[in-house]
């Protein structure tokens, strides 16, 4: 017994952990008997004091922390600023969520840390304070909820609710807080109910896999060990964990300090020896673990170490396997039950910050960092390796080392204040939380049109998908604007300075939007174009848009209008047509059947000669059934094939058309079904069926007739031919008549019986086999066509009174070739013939290439009556270079996106509404009623996202022509077609990154290449012929850039800090909210500039969304999005909640080898690497053995570390040796591979690692195998005892396999003996005779056998030592 003089007097409060340490030291010093006597005295003292004190808890004892008010206020202020920046588009939703969580979590943690000092200073004997730190009742988390703040809560799925509960239970909760609190309470109840069974089942599986592990030997003779070092390159290993790792272990090697041996091999380590190692700073200590034990199915005393119960070496016969399983499983059960009391409070982690010790200037090497965004959207520098940051003040130079993968939050040469955060240590190096990848969907808040910058990948991720990847940080904009559900097209009179939104047609949504605002709010008249309802108003039927609407390569929409109308009046006057439309009111009065005319106007409004102007489908030539088209007889060759009925390029190609020269054609009906390859057909080929016969499970025939089945690639074509079957005699030469049309009046169906046919028939020869054949006589539908349809049937007679240049000719086109099958989709009709109106005029030989026809929509108002017309006029074009522009194939059109103009005519004014890229424009009036060709003044501009601005085209002819006529006109760079604004110059402006104050919010604006291309507006005069004039000689005044101020709002509201720069406001430019545009007043809404005038600008409101690389954008450019549509998907990593109930599934995943970052995948790579290196050095035999063994040892250490992280994060201390015994069992098998075939084991067979080694040494040949990780369930089903396996799972299968293989169970484990009622082969009082004693003479043999291994012992230890260092650094 130690002398009293040597004992230390401790005068401090001790908790449960300190009592554990005290008891272990008492046992070391005094032994078991004396310790129990001391503990009895402690127990008596405790009860005596508790009785005398009689602590009870009252509501007055719950004292709120004084600093709570301003801490919560500060967090609310930060949240408000964060919300603003999310609104401005500086941070996206995931960054906002992360930062919001960390703000409130940090606030809650500060309150929690201040709770203890506050109680200690104000009321040290407070019952709440004493209870919470006694370890007996309650813990700090529960008391924190009572007196601090309840904080962030988790919902039942473990997801965090981002609205914190600011009140504590003493103050009481508001209604909202109470509802959120109920979520957390429900999570606690769910966890207690569900997870308890999970924890219990985990315990059962753990015990199952190691129940046979019993201490049977004193020493297995191994010479291997695992190195543990208290120091590594980056930081010191925590002393507590180092002591916990070493105490109770046995040394695998002698420990030398200098030349003196301080500890011997096979010596067990106590607290005194470990303290000496720490004092002398020993570099590395090699210890024995269950991993290194050479026993196959049990364990030796020295590899296990000390028993946790009494502190001596474990006794022989101890069932250490079951103890290990219970030790790991039991904390899970206890902690699951304990979460009920904390009630689902979220626990996370805060990042570590490096702060400046005093004021000074920052200096560092910029080559070692690169710019990036932090998790919260702050601009920062990422360190590649250890970075030395120097802080210089007037008299002190201080150096700080920032570890790799950390964020530096300041710039070089920046002045920092004392305590300012200069760096953030990356999370993950200091916390134990598991990560998981989560998808976060961002939904659109408003309806509008999506725009994005060039940083978004314009090609979708997959073909036919609308998901686009984001390679750079970029903004997405939703431009406001509603789509009108009734699809109204607007034709109303607008006045000067009106802002008008022209209708745009969306091919994806098939909706037409129109909004109009008039200055004097005149009544608006609409033309109805309802898609579906024909009966109510007699409006056009837009059932199929696909044949009419085509989108070009750049996704522009055709601004075309289609109408069918019975009252088409056409008047022609001097090379013009006027085709009027009816209004809704007139259509309602008299309902006339429609002719189905569709007028088709190109995107430019320009027609070439022989262009199709309109077409209509005659319902007489419409069929609902499939069939074959035939022209006359087979000898009729008078068919002229035209390549395309549209002779210009750029429009969506129609099918090949055939111009009709014949007066009739025939249609042979047949029923066609196209079935998948795997369809079950219920009829036979060449069989005859009736109407409504079942063909497949869900298809019935509509007609009766002969079945013909043809198998093609990946599909089956089934046809039903209706008609009569004729079996000819041998004398009948019917084969000559096969496949022909027979007219009425002649035909022989039988030599004995002849009669005249009433209708045309089609004769077809069918040969099921080579010898048999018969003839099928099929009915034929006949269609007669007149040579020409007179235009008088379409338009009134007075149209043709004045013969002039422009002519409308009528052509009929058959849409299917001779003998081609026509096939309709279900419930749709097939149009066989289309009648087209073709524009033509007499060519003028002198200017043949310069003539073209332009079509305009006009509206004429006379005495209050308004009529709408399409005007078609012949004009001479001076823009002869249009067809020669360098555009992609199929793009002969001019791809400026605001070309098709809309005209309105009133007696004294001629107004052009110019459609810009965003379907907006400003109307300008230019009154000149005396002349016939009236001119129009418009404003237009280039957009930031313009494609091709005619910069590389030469226009000498055009320029010369214009200069001759009017020498005052100067064309700046180039002159494009109608309405295109010319790019004069580019202005680049970079947003400066302000570093005036560290907490200023400018740091949120770090984007990749923040660059705007600003372009300047122009005024042009455009006449009717499309000629462009710049009559404003002082136009360079307009071209000067505006000097404007802009600024960003800072956190400090007392002084607004403005940075003056020369900024150009341009059309199409996007502005974020709170930008200074004029007079140093912030613009309160974000949007896009639509109109720039000298004294004002018009902005279309828009909502910005920030997206970072890796995000996925849903929807195409300029697609209309509705409120609630998915806009972006972010994929980000999230820490799981620190609750043990969230950690338990992770422990189970690791033990069952179902981990997300599965270790088995890493094993494969490691084995391949080891095999290559080691095989090169040693040759084949040793390569597999050492490669696999080192891989297994490394993976074992990884598994132990992963499991320990979960339990340590909860403050649960489990000794490593318990986890090691479990991990040893799930990594003890190897899989025999096919390389280097062995005579002993079969490929794919699971064998023990030690057994493979011993067999290889005995046979002196290499056995090739791969390391494999078995889950605990699979390991339990691959043991030496089939009785143990059968009593665990799959009883029938296990017993059947064991019977077939003739397996023998040697009853070595505990479980099989329990099942059979035998004596359990374990227990410390077991008969010594049955225990395998270690034989000393075997050690010399082992040393001889393992001499070869000693070559690699140093290297292997180095590897393991390195791995352990890595583990230590993460603790």
From Swiss-Prot:
Keywords of this entry: Chloroplast, DNA-directed RNA polymerase, Metal-binding, Nucleotidyltransferase, Plastid, Transcription, Transferase, Zinc
Where is this protein found? Plastid, Chloroplast
Q: What is its EC number?
A: 2.7.7.6
Q: Which SUPFAM superfamilies match?
A: beta and beta-prime subunits of DNA dependent RNA-polymerase
Q: What binding partners and quaternary form does the record give?
A: In plastids the minimal PEP RNA polymerase catalytic core is composed of four subunits: alpha, beta, beta', and beta''. When a (nuclear-encoded) sigma factor is associated with the core the holoenzyme is formed, which can initiate transcription.
Q: What does this protein do?
A: DNA-dependent RNA polymerase catalyzes the transcription of DNA into RNA using the four ribonucleoside triphosphates as substrates.
The protein in question is named DNA-directed RNA polymerase subunit beta''
Organism of derivation = Arabis hirsuta (Hairy rock-cress)
């Amino acid at each position: 017994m130690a002398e009293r003089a040597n004992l230390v007097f401790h005068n401090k409060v001790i908790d449960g952990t300190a009592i554990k340490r005290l008891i272990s030291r008492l046992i070391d010093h005094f032994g078991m008997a004396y310790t129990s006597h001391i503990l009895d005295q402690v127990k008596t003292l405790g009860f005596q004091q508790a009785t005398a004190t009689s602590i009870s808890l009252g509501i007055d004892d719950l004292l709120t922390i004084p600093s709570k008010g301003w801490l919560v206020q500060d967090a609310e202020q930060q949240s408000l600023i964060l919300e603003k920046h999310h609104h401005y588009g500086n941070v996206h939703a995931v960054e906002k969520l992360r930062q919001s969580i960390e703000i409130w979590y940090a606030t809650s943690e500060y309150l929690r840390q201040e709770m203890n000092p506050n109680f200690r200073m104000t009321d040290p004997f407070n019952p709440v304070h004493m209870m919470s730190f006694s370890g007996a009742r309650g813990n700090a988390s529960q008391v924190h909820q009572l007196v601090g703040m309840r904080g962030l809560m988790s919902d039942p799925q473990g997801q965090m609710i981002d609205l914190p509960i600011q009140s504590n239970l003493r103050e009481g909760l508001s209604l909202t807080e109470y509802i959120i609190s109920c979520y957390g309470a429900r999570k606690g109840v769910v966890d207690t109910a569900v997870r308890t069974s999970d924890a219990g089942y985990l315990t059962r599986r753990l015990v199952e896999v190691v129940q046979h592990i019993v201490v049977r030997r004193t020493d297995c003779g191994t010479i291997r060990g695992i190195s543990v070092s208290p120091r590594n390159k980056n930081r010191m290993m925590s002393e507590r964990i180092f002591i916990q790792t070493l105490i109770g272990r046995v040394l695998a090697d002698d420990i030398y300090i200098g030349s003196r041996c301080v500890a011997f091999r096979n010596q067990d380590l106590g607290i005194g020896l470990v303290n000496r190692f720490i004092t002398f700073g020993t570099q590395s200590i090699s210890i024995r673990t269950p991993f290194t034990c050479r026993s196959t199915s049990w364990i030796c005393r020295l590899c296990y170490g000390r028993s946790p119960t009494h502190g001596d070496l474990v006794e022989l016969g101890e069932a250490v396997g079951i103890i290990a399983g219970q030790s790991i499983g039991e904390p899970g059960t206890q902690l699951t039950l304990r979460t009920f009391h904390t009630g689902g409070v979220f626990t996370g982690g805060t990042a570590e910050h490096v702060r400046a010790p005093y004021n000074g200037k920052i200096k560092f090497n910029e080559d070692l960092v690169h710019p990036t965004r932090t998790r919260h959207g702050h601009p920062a520098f990422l360190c590649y390796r250890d970075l030395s940051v120097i802080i210089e003040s007037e008299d002190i130079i201080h150096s700080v080392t920032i570890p790799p993968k950390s964020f530096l939050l300041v710039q070089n040469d920046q002045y920092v204040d004392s305590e300012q955060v200069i760096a953030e240590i990356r999370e993950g190096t200091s916390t134990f939380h598991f990560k998981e990848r989560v998808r976060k969907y961002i939904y659109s808040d408003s309806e509008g049109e999506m725009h994005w910058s060039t940083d978004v990948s314009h090609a979708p991720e997959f073909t036919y998908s609308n998901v686009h990847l984001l390679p750079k940080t970029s903004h997405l904009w939703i431009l406001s604007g509603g789509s009108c559900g009734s699809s109204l097209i607007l034709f109303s009179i607008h006045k000067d300075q009106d802002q008008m939104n022209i209708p745009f047609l969306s091919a994806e949504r098939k909706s037409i939007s129109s909004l109009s605002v008039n200055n004097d709010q005149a009544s608006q008249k609409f033309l109805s174009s309802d898609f579906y309802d024909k009966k109510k108003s007699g409006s056009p039927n837009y059932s199929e848009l696909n044949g009419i609407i085509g989108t070009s390569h750049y996704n522009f929409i055709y601004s075309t209008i289609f109408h069918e109308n019975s009252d088409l009046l056409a008047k022609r006057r001097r090379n013009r047509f006027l085709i009027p439309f009816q209004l809704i009111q007139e259509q309602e009065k008299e309902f006339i059947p429609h002719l189905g005319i569709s007028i088709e106007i190109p995107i430019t409004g320009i027609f070439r000669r022989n262009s199709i102007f309109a077409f209509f489908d005659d319902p007489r030539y419409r069929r609902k059934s499939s069939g074959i088209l035939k022209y006359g007889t087979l000898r009729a060759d008078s068919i002229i094939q035209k390549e395309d009925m549209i002779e210009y390029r750029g429009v969506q190609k129609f099918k090949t058309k055939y111009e009709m020269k014949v007066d009739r054609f025939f249609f042979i009906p047949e029923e066609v079904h196209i079935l998948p390859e795997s369809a079950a057909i219920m009829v036979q080929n060449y069989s005859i069926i009736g109407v409504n016969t079942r063909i497949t499970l869900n298809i019935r025939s509509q007609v009766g007739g002969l079945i013909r089945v043809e198998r093609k690639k990946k599909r089956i074509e089934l046809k039903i031919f209706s008609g009569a079957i004729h079996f000819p005699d041998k004398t009948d030469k019917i084969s000559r008549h096969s496949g022909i049309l027979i007219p009425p009046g002649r035909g022989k169906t039988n030599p004995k019986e002849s009669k005249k046919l009433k209708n045309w028939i089609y004769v077809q020869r069918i040969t099921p086999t080579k010898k048999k054949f018969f003839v099928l006589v099929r009915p034929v539908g006949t269609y007669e066509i007149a040579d020409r349809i007179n235009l008088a049937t379409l338009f009134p007679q007075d149209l043709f009174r004045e013969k002039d240049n422009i002519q409308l000719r009528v052509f009929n086109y058959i849409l299917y070739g001779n003998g081609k099958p026509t096939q309709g989709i279900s419930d749709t009709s097939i149009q066989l013939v289309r009648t087209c109106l073709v524009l033509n005029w007499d060519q003028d030989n002198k200017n043949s290439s310069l003539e073209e026809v332009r079509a305009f929509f006009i509206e004429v108002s006379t005495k209050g009556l308004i009529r709408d017309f399409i005007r078609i006029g012949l004009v001479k074009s001076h823009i002869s270079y249009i067809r020669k522009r360098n555009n992609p194939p199929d793009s002969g059109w001019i791809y400026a996106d605001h070309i098709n103009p809309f005209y309105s005519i009133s007696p004294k004014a001629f107004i052009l509404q110019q459609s810009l890229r965003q379907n907006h424009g400003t109307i300008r009036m230019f009154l000149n009623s005396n002349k016939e060709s009236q001119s129009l003044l418009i404003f237009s501009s280039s957009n930031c996202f313009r494609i091709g601005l005619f910069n590389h085209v030469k226009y000498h002819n055009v320029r010369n022509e214009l200069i001759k006529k009017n020498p005052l006109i100067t064309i700046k760079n180039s002159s494009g077609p109608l309405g295109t604004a010319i790019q004069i110059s580019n202005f680049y402006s970079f947003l400066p990154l302000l570093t005036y104050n560290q907490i200023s919010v400018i740091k949120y604006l770090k984007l990749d290449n923040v660059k705007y291309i600003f372009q300047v507006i122009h005024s042009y005069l455009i006449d009717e012929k499309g000629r462009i004039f710049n009559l404003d000689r002082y136009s360079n005044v307009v071209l000067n850039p505006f000097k404007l101020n802009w600024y960003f709002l800072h956190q400090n509201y007392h002084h607004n800090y403005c940075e003056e720069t020369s900024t150009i406001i341009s059309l199409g430019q996007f502005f974020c909210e709170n930008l200074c545009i004029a007079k140093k007043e912030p613009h309160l809404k974000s949007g896009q500039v639509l109109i720039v005038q000298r004294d004002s600008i018009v902005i279309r409101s828009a909502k910005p969304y920030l997206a970072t690389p890796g995000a996925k954008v849903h929807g195409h450019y300029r697609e209309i999005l509705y409120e609630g549509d998915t806009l972006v998907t972010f994929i980000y990593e999230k820490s799981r909640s620190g609750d043990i109930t969230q950690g338990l599934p992770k422990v189970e995943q690791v033990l069952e080898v179902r981990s997300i970052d599965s270790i088995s995948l890493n094993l494969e790579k490691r084995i391949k690497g080891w095999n290559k290196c080691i095989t090169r050095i040693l040759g084949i035999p040793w390569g597999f053995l050492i490669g696999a063994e080192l891989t297994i040892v490394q993976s074992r250490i990884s598994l132990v570390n992963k499991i320990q992280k979960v339990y340590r994060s909860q403050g649960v201390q489990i000794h490593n040796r318990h986890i090691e015994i479990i991990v040893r069992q799930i990594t003890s098998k190897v899989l025999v591979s096919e390389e280097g075939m062995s005579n002993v084991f079969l490929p794919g067979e699971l064998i023990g690692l030690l057994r493979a080694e011993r067999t290889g040494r005995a046979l002196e040949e290499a056995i090739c195998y791969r390391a494999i990780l078995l889950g605990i369930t699979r390991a339990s089903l691959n043991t030496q005892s089939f009785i143990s396996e059968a009593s665990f799972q799959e009883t029938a299968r296990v017993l059947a396999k064991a019977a077939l293989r003739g397996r023998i169970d040697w009853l070595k484990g505990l479980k099989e003996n329990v099942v059979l009622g035998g004596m359990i082969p374990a227990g410390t009082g077991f008969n010594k005779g049955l225990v395998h004693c270690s034989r000393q003479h075997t050690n010399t043999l082992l040393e001889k056998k393992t001499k070869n291994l000693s070559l690699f012992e140093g290297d292997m230890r180095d590897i393991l030592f390195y791995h352990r260092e890595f583990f230590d650094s993460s603790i």
